[in-house]
Amino acid sequence: MTFRNCVAVDLGASSGRVMLARYERECRSLTLREIHRFNNGLHSQNGYVTWNVDSLESAIRLGLNKVCEEGIRIDSIGIDTWGVDFVLLDQQGQRVGLPVAYRDSRSNGLMAQAQQQLGKRDIYQRSGIQFLPFNTLYQLRALTEQQPELIPHIAHALLMPDYFSYRLTGKMNWEYTNATTTQLVNINSDDWDESLLAWSGANKAWFGRPTHPGNVIGHWICPQGNEIPVVAVASHDTASAVIASPLNGSRAAYLSSGTWSLMGFESQTPFTNDTALAANITNEGGAEGRYRVLKNIMGLWLLQRVLQERQINDLPALIAATQALPACRFIINPNDDRFINPEAMCSEIQAACREMAQPLPESDAELARCIFDSLALLYADVLHELAQLRGEDFSQLHIVGGGCQNTLLNQLCADACGIRVIAGPVEASTLGNIGIQLMTLDELNNVDDFRQVVSTTANLTTFTPNPDSEIAHYVAQLHSTRQTKELCA
């Protein structure tokens, strides 16, 4: 038997994990084992909301060392993280300034300024990326305007996964799928857009040309002295999750469900027409030259904050209590900027309900019901937008990532969207990370080949839409009375 041992480092906004994958060539079987799981979160530092990258690096190294201590020969390592955030380095490779998180308020108002000065349509035609107030384009403008004293010291700007790969290998890389999330990559050249960089105030010399997934960045020297290749995987976690989505045919859509929900479809060509711009659709880079045509939805961040504020530890019990409540009594727009990082999420949700003359969700279960119903309705809205954009309805929706374990939300999504939902795999980002490593090691031919492996090894659950459910009736009523595109606009 021929085995490959690949390690995926998968960092999310709320947690990280080091996972060991064992691939058996002859039977094309893939098994995952969690080596080390650790928390991640936002920190307040010198007036900024930041990431503790030193703690994350220590956790990554701890996980890798654990694998080596077991006597396992690692064939390769790959790192994926969330998008848009970056670390600045000087000529010696030392950090400059703080690793500020995208939920910091420093870029407030700069998106509107960019649209006014450059033109919204021109920015979109250049980048193909949706307008979000925390995109790297606006973060860099905030940095160069608010901290000009740092600029003479900056030699390099590395996005998060590239930074951690650099810390392991000493080699710098700018991976394409994650680079596209910055709104700074030209959609036609796949290189940094000089006009957008100039507006941001960043120096083009801070960046190297983006590289597509599958190259070896460098090597990590394990404690035993072995040189282990570190592969540039599809380092944006959603790009990795999509690779592991067992999409079957062109009529399949995906929803990567976690702190963020990202709904979209794969395409060989980007969509940058007026319809896409009006819907704020993004065309992020994917593997093998594919585009991830999608839309960001605030996701389970709202629930995570409610769990934290209410000190709720038993999520299954909360979901059970939520399921017993009537649907659609409390509806908010999860994509409202007010929910990006409010001081108190529960109060913010209640305020939004009050402003729309709705009952107030008071109990833990009512708050959760508000979030689940609102997300499902927004999923239905976005899926409809995507279908209109491509000119063809979808036949099924694949929900992947940690959020796909929420069976109530899965069923609400199926009912609201009126579409068959297939949930799984849970560790989609990890699996997609591993998939690119196996392709780089010449164990698999391409993404479609890897998806066949996922389909036969992952636990998948199907949810059939119930047209008689409360939320399905609510959607039908909405469609008959509302013509606006955005939910609760």
Curated annotation (Swiss-Prot):
Residues that coordinate or bind substrate: G83, H236, D237, T238, N296
GO cellular component, one term: cytosol
Binding site for ATP: A13, S14, S15, G16, R17, T259, Q304, G402
Enzyme class at the top of the EC tree: transferase
Entry keywords, A to Z: ATP-binding, Disulfide bond, Kinase, Magnesium, Nucleotide-binding, Rhamnose metabolism, Transferase
Reaction it catalyzes: L-rhamnulose + ATP = L-rhamnulose 1-phosphate + ADP + H(+)
InterPro entries linked: ATPase_NBD (IPR043129), FGGY_C (IPR018485), FGGY_N (IPR018484), Rhamnulokinase (IPR013449)
Cofactor(s) needed: Mg(2+)
Pfam families: FGGY_C (PF02782), FGGY_N (PF00370)
Disulfide bonds listed in the record: C68-C222, C353-C370, C413-C417
Record-annotated active site: D237
Any GO molecular function: ATP binding
Enzyme Commission number(s) of this protein: 2.7.1.5
Domain of life of the source: Bacteria
Pathway of action: Carbohydrate degradation; L-rhamnose degradation; glycerone phosphate from L-rhamnose: step 2/3
GO biological process: one example: rhamnose catabolic process
Family in the record: Belongs to the rhamnulokinase family.
Task performed by this protein: Involved in the catabolism of L-rhamnose (6-deoxy-L-mannose). Catalyzes the transfer of the gamma-phosphate group from ATP to the 1-hydroxyl group of L-rhamnulose to yield L-rhamnulose 1-phosphate.
Protein name listed in UniProt: Rhamnulokinase
Species this protein is from: Shigella sonnei (strain Ss046)
Lineage of the organism: Bacteria, Pseudomonadati, Pseudomonadota, Gammaproteobacteria, Enterobacterales
